[in-house]
Amino acid sequence: MCDRNGGRRLRQWLIEQIDSSMYPGLIWENEEKSMFRIPWKHAGKQDYNQEVDASIFKAWAVFKGKFKEGDKAEPATWKTRLRCALNKSPDFEEVTDRSQLDISEPYKVYRIVPEEEQKCKLGVATAGCVNEVTEMECGRSEIDELIKEPSVDDYMGMIKRSPSPPEACRSQLLPDWWAQQPSTGVPLVTGYTTYDAHHSAFSQMVISFYYGGKLVGQATTTCPEGCRLSLSQPGLPGTKLYGPEGLELVRFPPADAIPSERQRQVTRKLFGHLERGVLLHSSRQGVFVKRLCQGRVFCSGNAVVCKGRPNKLERDEVVQVFDTSQFFRELQQFYNSQGRLPDGRVVLCFGEEFPDMAPLRSKLILVQIEQLYVRQLAEEAGKSCGAGSVMQAPEEPPPDQVFRMFPDICASHQRSFFRENQQITV
């Protein structure tokens, strides 16, 4: 049975906020209370005050569970969410001839559409359910604002007023590993051949792409310097390189395989903000990521400080998202029956907050990253556990032992991975 209460949540909530007189500029436009004003000041204005001008948008984000105190403030995103909901809800209609956007205290005017009028427009017999709008149903401009960072003007207007994330949740600042790389062909470490033999197990990554929760492609990286996840073709004339020349390019699979036309459209829209991509590097210490693209990127991994809440990667910052030593410690505890099998995966979510309460199938683009060696250890641990045997795993395997174990593990678990439209067997 259709639940019509879901579509009334915004209407009821907004009327309550107007009547509360708690939000400056949010007032009734007429005595009949059929129209209302909502403040609409641009975040780039010199006199923009986040606490005042974004208060109603923040309140909606809190109500929807998209923001809680201590999270990083994102006024532009809050505003886009409410605008999207207003524009798509049958309960509201913008009255453009009453809106004033060119004055010092700009505002928009919306009319509350009576239910009888809605029925006349839709037809009682074919009205169907009026459910609360989702972000996937936003128009092009709304989607564009939801998935990318605010413009430079917006950002500069709000940066002084946006509280930083709590100190406890801030990642440690790390040196830019990629910026320190020498030219192609120069050894990264003295005696590089030996180094490569011992550490290739940790430098190789298995990268899996999920669109709408479905696996659409996989790749394994082989370059010790790391890789760049991007959409652009390598080596095209006039193409600007982002990162060292020696980086391996792993391309996002095309959106053609997505069955839903609407999802394909939105995914391709998101692609437009991922041109510069992200850089990935894997080593004995763990997995590191540097976001270069304009589109927002969120992540999860065992090295993320704050678990169970959205973790946004700041642009041009190097962040450790996976700690290999921590994985080994937890794996040892698992073998000693002192803990669960540790998760060796890192997940990047492009354009949408993650992790959150939304199911993974609702996410447009998820990229899962695993160190190949860690992946094989986890598989072996799962098998040994299922067989009832206990395999002793050293907390920190010596390099020579790693090098001996690695070929054997890989030989027994051959599989094909997708990269650059080729099948690659490891």
Curated annotation (Swiss-Prot):
PTMs per UniProt: Ubiquitinated. Ubiquitination by TRIM21 in macrophages, a process that is strongly increased upon interferon gamma stimulation, leds to the enhanced transcriptional activity of target cytokine genes. Ubiquitination leads to its degradation by the proteasome.
Q: Which Pfam families match?
A: IRF, IRF-3
Record text on subunit structure and interactions: Interacts (via C-terminus) with TRIM21 (via C-terminus). Interacts with the BATF-JUNB heterodimer. Interacts with BATF (via bZIP domain); the interaction is direct. Interacts with COPS2. Interacts with SPI1.
Q: Which residues bind DNA?
A: 7-114
Q: Does the keyword Nucleus apply?
A: yes
Q: In which tissues is it expressed?
A: Predominantly expressed in lymphoid tissues.
What do we know about what induces or represses this protein's expression? By IFNG/IFN-gamma. Negatively regulated by microRNA-155 (miR155).
Keyword set for this entry?
Activator, Autophagy, Cytoplasm, Disease variant, DNA-binding, Nucleus, Repressor, Transcription, Transcription regulation, Ubl conjugation
Where in or outside the cell is it found? Nucleus; Cytoplasm
A single GO molecular function, which one? DNA-binding transcription repressor activity, RNA polymerase II-specific
| GO CC term, one of those recorded | chromatin
Q: Does the keyword Ubl conjugation apply?
A: yes
Protein name per UniProt:
Interferon regulatory factor 8
Source domain of life is Eukaryota
Q: What does this protein do?
A: Transcription factor that specifically binds to the upstream regulatory region of type I interferon (IFN) and IFN-inducible MHC class I genes (the interferon consensus sequence (ICS)). Can both act as a transcriptional activator or repressor. Plays a negative regulatory role in cells of the immune system.
Q: Name one GO biological process term.
A: negative regulation of transcription by RNA polymerase II
What is the organism of origin for this protein?
Homo sapiens
- Variant or mutagenesis effect after changing residue 197 to T: In a breast cancer sample; somatic mutation
Disease as annotated in the protein's UniProt record: Immunodeficiency 32A: An immunologic disorder characterized by abnormal peripheral blood myeloid phenotype with a marked loss of CD11C-positive/CD1C dendritic cells, resulting in selective susceptibility to mycobacterial infections.
Q: What is its main location?
A: nucleus
Protein family according to the UniProt entry: Belongs to the IRF family.
Q: Impact of mutating residue 108 to R?
A: In resting macrophages, no effect on cytoplasmic subcellular localization. No effect on nuclear subcellular localization upon IFN-gamma induction. No effect on transcriptional activator activity
